[in-house]
Amino acid sequence: MHNEIEAQFLDINKDEIRKKLKEIGAGCVKSEVLMRRFVFDTGPHSFARVRDEGGGKIVMTYKNVSDEESILGTKEVNVVIDNYENGVLFMRGCGLEEKAEQESYRETWMFGEVEICIDTWPWIPTFIEIEGPSEEAVWDTAEKMGLKREKAKFGSVDSTYQYYYGVDEDIVNLHTPKIMFDMEPPEWARKRLH
């Protein structure tokens, strides 16, 4: 497994971020696409998933989040596969319990070796993830984009829901079987804190 060196910046304006990305010389490598995923329970602070990233790319991932306060707090391993349904069946066959079926929209940009993703999830404002080969690369890119290090968040999207709604991550992870755009939000997602 390797460290996922990534920082999130919440509540962004897509048009302003796209403009800033163009200004610094980043290029859009994948237009906004609907992604769908099944997430599986693998124990405390970790999960596995099968994600259809659009354009025929299917990825199975295992993540362990040991520290949601650190840019180096997440380790992951990814395997590209050729069939979404078979990936889900594989996880089930290994005895993993499904946590949730989820969807989001993602647009991907590159700035050198740094990947910038504009992510939109149900019931929360759009945010970006900046992922790079080193902490320095992530922070340099954020600075060029006018983003402040002290505003960065870390961890998985469940911690983003926790930030906006004050709900325990286990409620998002273990007790919300679907997070989809075409559904009414669950009770916990009806009153935002931020």
PLM segments and residue spans:
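Short histidine-centered beta-strand/loop micro-motifs
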Residues: 119-120
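N-terminal strand-loop-strand beta-hairpin
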Residues: 1-116, 148-194
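A hydrophobic, small-residue-rich beta->alpha segment in the mid-to-C-terminal subdomain
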Residues: 135, 141-150
